[in-house]
């Protein structure tokens, strides 16, 4: 009996010493890369072609080949909102890429902002996150690390706006002429 009891403190000491209480290293750069409608097998299929920064992301980043988010309408706006905020898009009003706004009595783009002006070109539409009173990943990073810069770039307006969150430093998206533009919601 004495023999078996002597092992108990030794095992307890081993487990308590082997537990690592240190915090993980905080990364200097966080990139959320979303490729709309890209199948995950294409990442490995063309693996030998990747070089530079993309090669580094493939070798050292975290990527998900079978990620799912539960919402019924899988258009760009709702999907990118779910990724950028971790919330169900319909609950805050992102019910599609465009929808009928009862207050305005017209069909609107999900990131339409009638109070914003285009910055960066003469043509294009001003977009912003102003319709949504919620935060996202970029906002959480800035709230935890005040020196952080959040920049959201997308080919589509709703991609840049909805993945950037409420207060990114910049959101850039293409206009119909193929130029990157923004709105005065983000820059002056």
What are these regions (language model features)?
Residues 41-43, 76, 160-163:
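Extracytoplasmic/secreted cell-surface and envelope-processing proteins
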Residues 8-16:
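Bacterial N-terminal signal peptides
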Residues 1-8:
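Bacterial N-terminal signal peptides that target proteins for export
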Residues 15-26:
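Bacterial Sec-dependent signal peptides at the C-terminal "C-region" and cleavage site
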Residues 27-39, 57, 83, 141:
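Beta-strand elements within well-structured catalytic alpha/beta cores of enzymes
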Residues 44-91, 149-153:
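Short, structured active-site-proximal loop/turn typified by the sulfatase FGly-forming signature C/S-X-P-X-R
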Residues 96-188:
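His/Asp/Glu-rich, glycine-adjacent segments
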Residues 39-45, 69, 123-128:
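Second-shell loop/turn segments in exported
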């Amino acid at each position: 009996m004495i023999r078996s009891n002597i092992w108990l403190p030794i095992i307890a000491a081993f487990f308590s010493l082997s537990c690592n209480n240190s915090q993980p290293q905080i990364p200097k750069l966080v990139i959320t890369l979303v490729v709309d409608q890209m199948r995950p097998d294409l990442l490995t299929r063309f693996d030998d072609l990747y070089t530079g920064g993309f090669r580094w992301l493939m070798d050292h980043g975290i990527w998900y080949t079978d990620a799912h988010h539960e919402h019924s309408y899988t258009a760009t706006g709702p999907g990118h909102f779910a990724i950028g905020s971790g919330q169900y898009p319909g609950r805050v009003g992102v019910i599609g890429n465009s929808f009928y706004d009862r207050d305005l009595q017209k069909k609107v783009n999900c990131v339409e902002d009638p109070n914003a002006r285009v910055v960066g070109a003469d043509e294009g539409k001003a977009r912003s996150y102003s319709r949504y009173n919620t935060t996202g990943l970029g906002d959480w990073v800035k709230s935890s690390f005040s020196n952080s810069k959040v920049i959201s770039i997308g080919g589509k307006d709703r991609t840049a706006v909805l993945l950037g969150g409420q207060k990114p430093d910049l959101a850039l998206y293409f206009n119909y002429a193929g130029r990157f533009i923004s709105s005065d919601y983000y820059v002056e």
